[in-house]
Amino acid sequence: MVKTQRVVITPGEPAGIGPDLVVQLAQREWPVELVVCADATLLTDRAAMLGLPLTLRPYSPNSPAQPQTAGTLTLLPVALRESVTAGQLAIENGHYVVETLARACDGCLNGEFAALITGPVHKGVINDAGIPFTGHTEFFEERSQAKKVVMMLATEELRVALATTHLPLRDIADAITPALLHEVIAILHHDLRTKFGIAEPRILVCGLNPHAGEGGHMGTEEIDTIIPVLDELRAQGMILNGPLPADTLFQPKYLDNADAVLAMYHDQGLPVLKYQGFGRGVNITLGLPFIRTSVDHGTALELAGRGEADVGSFITALNLAIKMIVNTQ
């Protein structure tokens, strides 16, 4: 890395394990400066509950970034709306969570930060606070005015991107249009090259229907939509294999010759990935004008403040973001 970079972290729901995980991240040295967008008392109280040392250093945007030393975090303060009891949601803090996300996103857009790593949020409490919120991905897409974003989850061994995300099953077939597939595959291909450093990405594409439609006998979306799009993109030089039946695609004979899988919908691709690497997975938002990674788990309210939360996914998300920073320099 040519110079030390700053990454911004949002711990997420303050009553959940996000603050615990951030405190655990601070127990080791990092080659980047970790700027945490959070309430100071929340972090120091949670560190005390966990019995872990933590020193908060003020964020100085006009000073050169410094590698983070063990036992420290750089604080970009955002005040809680209500005091926090570990494990107990407070509706007003839905506003606090969104404020941290907005500040972190804006800092990435204006060049303050080289990447954003997000902890788990509780969508219900944010909506209960009167803020329409469907997820990080959609929030950052809207705030950054990105034309289109793509959700991808990854472990060290497998990357799975989604053509559609949080849609009911009954709506998915209608959503799989030529325009959507062109856009999603273009973003996936571009970001695999620029953010992951893969010169010629090899992408496996799932069919939509069982047996990838069985030649039109189990649905015609493959024939009518998916195959024509793949043929057009192959003619442009992309390396695309598919559409393949999703129940056989996730085998070494296919995966060993691929850099990513494109699944048509959420529960087609993610169960395999989460079974293979739950707790070590990372959520990446492709198509944003900045790097964003996230943990692949929820708020786990019942574990907050108890010292039982596994920091593995957060470490993986941070390490991946650092690699992506290097690839984009």
Swiss-Prot record:
Binding locations of substrate: H136, T137, K274, N283, R292
Pfam families linked: PdxA
UniProt keyword annotations, A-Z: Cobalt, Cytoplasm, Magnesium, Metal-binding, NAD, NADP, Oxidoreductase, Pyridoxine biosynthesis, Zinc
Molecular function in Gene Ontology: 4-hydroxythreonine-4-phosphate dehydrogenase activity; cobalt ion binding; magnesium ion binding; NAD binding; zinc ion binding
Cofactor: Zn(2+); Mg(2+); Co(2+)
Subcellular location: Cytoplasm
GO BP terms, alphabetized: pyridoxal phosphate biosynthetic process; pyridoxine biosynthetic process
Residues given in the record as a divalent metal cation binding sites: H166, H211, H266
Main location, first listed in the record: cytoplasm
Cellular component GO terms held in the UniProt record: cytoplasm
Annotated EC: 1.1.1.262
Cofactor remark: Binds 1 divalent metal cation per subunit. Can use ions such as Zn(2+), Mg(2+) or Co(2+).
Pathway given in the UniProt record: Cofactor biosynthesis; pyridoxine 5'-phosphate biosynthesis; pyridoxine 5'-phosphate from D-erythrose 4-phosphate: step 4/5
InterPro entries per UniProt: PdxA, PdxA_fam
Catalytic activity: 4-(phosphooxy)-L-threonine + NAD(+) = 3-amino-2-oxopropyl phosphate + CO2 + NADH
Record function comment: Catalyzes the NAD(P)-dependent oxidation of 4-(phosphooxy)-L-threonine (HTP) into 2-amino-3-oxo-4-(phosphooxy)butyric acid which spontaneously decarboxylates to form 3-amino-2-oxopropyl phosphate (AHAP).
Leftover remarks: The active site is located at the dimer interface.
NCBIfam families listed in its UniProt record: pdxA (TIGR00557)
Protein family according to the UniProt entry: Belongs to the PdxA family.
Quaternary data: Homodimer.
Official protein name in the record: 4-hydroxythreonine-4-phosphate dehydrogenase
Organism: Shigella boydii serotype 4 (strain Sb227)
Upper taxonomic lineage: Bacteria, Pseudomonadati, Pseudomonadota, Gammaproteobacteria, Enterobacterales
